[in-house]
């Protein structure tokens, strides 16, 4: 049926019409078509153990579950008050970072570039930097411009020298301009997060690139919190703030982007909403300790903080009872504050909920993919629930195998392999040769769900095809309850699907589960 003013079809229905189906069929004739039988034969081969062996033998990334460094750097930068991320690279690169963040958080994502093109990539982009910083400062009036790299790393542009030259030419006058080298062709968004955060702290603590004296640490009782690259940053950071407030702990959240990615619609446009105050960023050097919620997001930042005399503690995405216990014990030990009764009661509620639902989760097999801290945290929680994390895959988790070996050492399921440096094409082989009950990961897993029939539970980044997941915490006891409910809902949905045929399977299509 064609479009008409009386009956407007959206794309979900429009392209099913006969005229569009015929157009798509005709289009295939000009695309070097293959015999459908041969296509199905090859598909069948890719589902076999023999193909899996060849797949894992190849040093090839077909469908990596990671993004590039500058995305993580932009994510960090917007977590500071009045900060505009400035990527020394092309406009297309920045369009990718902005769209990626906007599609996940459903919020505008401010970021600019030096608009490098082919000539600047060959001969250097100094002039692009000078003009770009001047335009950014004059048009958007940021308190801080955080400069990172992308395409410029191919030729090796020196950001520090370029920024100094730009300041000498008057491009930037009053704004602080920290920087970090974040080449897009090595590492991942997690590496970029780490490099950018270290660069910002280094700027404020070590004398603003030689334009101010280095700060001298005067220890106080505050604690710094680093959230890491996190698709649930809005809900998680708010949950951590709530816990710290209940315990009466003075704190600073470094790179606090919980407001900029959840700005209210109230008639006032805010390009920069919330964020860690510039003064608090500098004063964070005086804190008693710094806690990283994600170890592998801060592999360079935490040693830098430690060099300045602070205690440093790291966790791996604290989901569930044991992980939250460890977090609260660490907070209590460092601060000297008691764990309040309210948190003890929340713990009891989570334990009660797990006990209520254990019969439905116990023994279920799960495959997990995503960032290394996320994979570790979810695997630990699944073991806590009595489930089996059969496959744990992290494209950007070089150390996840060793850490998971320690985690699984006491598992009733024995040694469960982890797959660092592997991608979603490897996961496809795993799901066909060693099937599981459920898959946990980001939006890109929906193609694995369609291909292998493994139901997908969406946790991680990015999640494009569902809305507002980022507003709810997955850390802490309350976050553990949210994850538990998400898992149970998918389990019950699958039970309903398999028991809904009248007269055949509906004997178990129950109201009560």
From Swiss-Prot:
Family annotation (SUPFAM superfamilies): Helical backbone' metal receptor (SSF53807)
Residues bound to [8Fe-7S] cluster are 68, 93, 150
Q: Which PROSITE patterns does the entry link to?
A: NITROGENASE_1_1, NITROGENASE_1_2
Instruction: Give a GO molecular function annotation for the protein.
Output: nitrogenase activity
Top EC class of this enzyme: oxidoreductase
Q: How is the cofactor bound?
A: Binds 1 [8Fe-7S] cluster per heterodimer.
Q: Pfam families, per this entry?
A: DUF3364, Oxidored_nitro
- Keywords from the named record: ATP-binding, Iron, Iron-sulfur, Metal-binding, Nitrogen fixation, Nucleotide-binding, Oxidoreductase
What GO terms in the biological process aspect are recorded for it?
nitrogen fixation
One CC-aspect GO term: molybdenum-iron nitrogenase complex
Q: Which Gene3D superfamilies match?
A: Nitrogenase molybdenum iron protein domain, Nitrogenase Molybdenum-iron Protein, subunit B, domain 4
Q: Describe its function.
A: This molybdenum-iron protein is part of the nitrogenase complex that catalyzes the key enzymatic reactions in nitrogen fixation.
- Family from the record: Belongs to the NifD/NifK/NifE/NifN family.
This chain belongs to the protein called Nitrogenase molybdenum-iron protein beta chain
């Amino acid at each position: 049926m064609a479009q008409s003013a009386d009956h407007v079809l959206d794309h979900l229905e429009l392209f099913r019409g006969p005229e569009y189906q015929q157009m798509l069929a005709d289009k295939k004739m000009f695309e070097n078509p293959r015999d459908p039988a041969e296509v199905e034969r090859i598909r069948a081969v890719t589902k076999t153990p023999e193909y899996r062996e060849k797949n894992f033998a190849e040093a090839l990334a077909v469908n990596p579950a990671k993004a590039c460094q500058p995305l993580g750097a932009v994510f960090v930068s917007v977590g500071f008050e009045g900060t505009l991320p400035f990527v020394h690279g092309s406009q297309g690169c920045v369009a990718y970072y902005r769209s990626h963040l906007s599609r996940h958080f459903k919020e505008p994502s401010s970021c600019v570039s030096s608009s490098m093109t082919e000539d600047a990539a060959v001969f250097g982009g100094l002039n692009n930097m000078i003009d770009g910083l001047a335009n950014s400062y004059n048009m958007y009036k940021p308190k801080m411009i955080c400069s990172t790299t992308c395409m410029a790393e191919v030729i090796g542009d020196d950001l520090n020298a370029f920024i100094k030259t730009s300041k000498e030419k008057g491009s930037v006058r009053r704004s602080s301009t920290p920087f970090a080298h974040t080449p897009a062709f090595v590492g991942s968004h997690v590496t970029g997060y780490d490099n950018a955060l270290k660069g910002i702290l280094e700027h404020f603590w070590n004398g603003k690139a030689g334009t101010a004296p280095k700060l001298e640490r005067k220890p106080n009782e505050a604690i710094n919190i680093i959230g890491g690259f996190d698709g649930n940053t809005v809900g998680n950071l708010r949950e951590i703030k709530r816990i710290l407030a209940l315990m009466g702990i003075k704190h600073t959240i470094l790179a606090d982007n919980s407001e900029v990615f959840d700005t209210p619609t109230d008639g006032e446009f805010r390009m920069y909403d919330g964020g860690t105050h510039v003064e608090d960023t500098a004063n964070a050097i005086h804190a008693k300790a710094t806690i990283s919620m994600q170890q592998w997001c801060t592999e360079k930042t935490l040693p830098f903080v430690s060099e300045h005399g602070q205690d440093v503690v790291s966790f791996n995405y604290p989901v569930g009872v044991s992980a939250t216990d460890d977090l609260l014990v660490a907070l209590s030990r460092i601060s000297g504050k008691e764990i309040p009764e309210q948190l003890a009661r929340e713990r009891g509620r989570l334990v009660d909920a797990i006990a209520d639902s254990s019969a439905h989760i116990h023994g279920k097999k799960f495959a997990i993919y995503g960032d290394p801290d996320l994979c570790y945290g979810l695997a630990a929680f699944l073991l806590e629930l009595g489930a089996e994390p059969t496959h744990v895959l992290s494209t950007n988790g070089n150390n996840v195998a060793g850490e998971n070996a320690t985690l699984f050492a006491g598992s009733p399921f024995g040694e469960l392999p982890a797959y660092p440096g592997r991608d979603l094409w490897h996961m496809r082989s795993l799901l066909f040769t060693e099937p599981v009950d459920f898959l946990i990961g980001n939006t890109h897993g929906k193609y694995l769900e369609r291909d292998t029939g493994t139901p997908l539970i969406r946790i991680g980044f990015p999640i494009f095809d569902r809305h507002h997941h980022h507003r709810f915490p997955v850390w802490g006891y309350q976050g553990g309850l949210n994850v538990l409910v998400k898992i149970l809902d998918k389990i019950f949905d699958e039970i309903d699907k398999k028991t809904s045929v009248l007269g055949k399977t509906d004997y178990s299509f129950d109201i009560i589960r």
